[in-house]
């Protein structure tokens, strides 16, 4: 009996150690999601449990916000991940300039979305440095409009999202055993063949995760769409529709339904990317060293 009691004590201790983390997750993630899900089926104006979802998908001012958000999130994801791969590949080895270059590339993370948007208004605005430089160099004579439209929001998503994609790709590329490429080089593989035949297949899991996280971050765009876009026009994203329902119309039930739709679209895209990964790679999650 004493043996059973003593053997059960470590397991009970581990359970108690996990309890605070579980309580934290339930309080901050599970409960708000469950509450919002239930609230979405309780429309403020009645009409049945699915009234909010019916209103969203039949309102010409609401359902197009999904397409608008996708038109911003998908290109931003492709650009961020596509540029992050060669940059991370170039900085994969330790060198005197590697840390300096990495620090410069991740600076936007420390500034915050609002500060980045304010800086972009100063730099890319009609009277900003960038348009004035183009006009001064006679490279472009017409009016340059890179703010308060689609391009302003897209640029903001690229500037703020690239550091995350870069750091993810840098960690994956740095984790690939360099002796694999050196072995291929001894067999006559040039640098491009080394990248295409060795690094790229092993990077598929990292590419997928970076793309998923970049997409989720870009799809939830809100400050950039308001500050650098046209929130009543071409950059009225789904998060703006949810904010208007909650804070202008005080219809928290409809806002919850919009948030659920937003989460479902994100989940659908992420699941599609994770499923597509199996067609390109079926090995371990990383190509780690050793």
Across the structure, where does each feature detected by a protein language model lie?
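Transmembrane alpha-helical segments of polytopic membrane transport and secretion proteins
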Residues: 1-19, 96-98, 271-290
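Interhelical loop and adjacent transmembrane-helix boundary motif
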Residues: 3-13, 50-61, 225-275
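Membrane-water interface segments at the C-terminal ends of transmembrane alpha-helices
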Residues: 13-44, 60-143, 148-173, 202, ...
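Short amphipathic alpha-helical coupling elements at transmembrane boundaries
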Residues: 42, 51-58, 102, 132-139, ...
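Transmembrane helix boundary and interhelical loop/hinge segments in multi-pass membrane proteins
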Residues: 46-49, 126-127, 172-182, 191-193, ...
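Glycine/proline-centered hinge or cleavage motifs at structural transition points of membrane proteins
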Residues: 187-188, 201
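Gly/Pro- and small hydrophobic-enriched strand-loop and loop-to-helix capping segments
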Residues: 192-194, 232-233
């Amino acid at each position: 009996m004493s043996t059973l009691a003593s053997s059960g004590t470590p397991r009970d201790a581990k359970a108690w150690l996990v309890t605070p983390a579980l309580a934290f997750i339930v309080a901050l993630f599970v409960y708000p999601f469950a509450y919002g899900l239930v609230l979405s089926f309780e429309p403020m104006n009645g009409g049945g449990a699915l009234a909010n979802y019916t209103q969203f998908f039949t309102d010409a001012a609401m359902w197009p916000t999904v397409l608008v958000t996708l038109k911003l999130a998908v290109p931003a994801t492709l650009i961020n991940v596509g540029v992050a791969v060669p940059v991370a590949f170039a900085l994969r080895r330790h060198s005197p300039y590697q840390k300096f270059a990495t620090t410069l590339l991740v600076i936007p993370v420390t500034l915050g979305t609002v500060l980045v948007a304010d800086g972009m208004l100063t730099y890319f605005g009609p009277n900003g440095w960038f348009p004035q430089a183009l006009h001064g160099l006679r490279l472009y004579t017409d009016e340059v409009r890179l703010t308060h439209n689609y391009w302003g929001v897209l640029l903001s998503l690229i500037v703020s999202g690239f550091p995350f994609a870069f750091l993810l790709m840098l960690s994956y590329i740095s984790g690939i055993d360099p002796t694999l490429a050196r072995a291929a080089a001894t067999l006559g593989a040039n640098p491009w063949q080394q990248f295409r035949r060795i690094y790229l297949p092993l990077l598929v899991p990292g590419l997928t995760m970076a793309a998923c996280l970049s997409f989720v971050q870009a799809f939830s765009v809100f400050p950039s769409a308001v500050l650098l876009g046209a929130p009543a026009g071409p950059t009225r994203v789904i998060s703006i529709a949810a904010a208007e329902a909650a804070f202008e119309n005080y219809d928290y039930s409809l806002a919850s339904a919009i948030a659920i739709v937003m989460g479902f679209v994100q989940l659908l895209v992420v699941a599609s990317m994770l499923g597509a990964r199996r067609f390109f790679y079926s090995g371990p999650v990383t190509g780690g060293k050793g």
